[in-house]
């Protein structure tokens, strides 16, 4: 099984582009840059869309331009149109329960309170079997501070760690698509940002 669709979650507009909640967007932007795939607005998928070869595999890239809690409105129509099964989808998103500089790949699971994941699960007929790239942004310590934290910008040292982890995740995606998931996970999960 290979990955055919990679979606990077976030909120649209310049006021959100540098916020922690857009870490998934940063990953897809990095993939587009490093693989020379242009992303263009596509109304029928409610997002920025492009396709190209990554490690010899045709991959669809999507950045929903809906707000985070409507991410499924973008992901589901694209998956349906190209007949991409749920387990051929990778969703990149910010993860409160991991430190900046850490990224992990997992398959399936709940939404963990993440509204973007919740909407995708809802619009995929409650099928949770897609892969996730969890990009650590850390937890602010109290649930009342979560909204301000995810919609805030990371301090520069923290941001640098997030970007290093995203770069490594991009390299590991190539390993995953060329070789196997386990090899990519072993490398990515042992990565430590400086």
Curated annotation (Swiss-Prot):
The record marks 94 as: Stabilizes the basic form of H active site to accept a proton. GO terms for biological process: protein quality control for misfolded or incompletely synthesized proteins; rescue of stalled ribosome. It holds the Pfam family Pept_tRNA_hydro. TRNA binds at residues 16, 67, 69, 115. Keywords: Cytoplasm, Hydrolase, RNA-binding, tRNA-binding. The record marks 11 as: Discriminates between blocked and unblocked aminoacyl-tRNA. Monomer. Belongs to the PTH family. This is Peptidyl-tRNA hydrolase. It comes from Colwellia psychrerythraea (strain 34H / ATCC BAA-681).
